[in-house]
């Protein structure tokens, strides 16, 4: 099965359906995913891909992923993790979600869906694609086309009336 990051299965689906979640087989699967996405399988990309491309969909920050890598003995700088995540996003393997331009999450689910952002918990929660509708989009300026639409709904706790 060839992987097309724009139309094919998600990287996590390819990995979870074909291999166990450990060992050399996992590294080989990640290498294949990276090559199919047009990325050279470097040690750092393989290590981070092995943590990301699992059956469970997740939202993760570079700092969170760096901590996971450290627990497994993979010493990488946060900058390396951030750059690698951006490369994965550019290749269509994951989605990038920016919060106020200050904090960046990466989503392993590249399918169409929106997100809630729970402000006081700094947490991202998926909204199923069928649970939200978007009306007609505006016509873009001459010479441009719409490449994607991201929906992020910010949530704060309801206040109890006194």
Where are these regions (language model features)?
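Intrinsically disordered, low-complexity serine/threonine- and proline-rich regulatory segments
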Residues: 1-47, 53-54
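Alpha-helix N-cap and coil->helix boundary residues
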Residues: 43-44, 60-64, 80
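DNA-recognition alpha helix
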Residues: 61-73
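Basic amphipathic alpha-helical segments that dock to polyanions
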Residues: 81-91
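Non-DNA-binding regulatory cores of transcription-related proteins
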Residues: 90-162
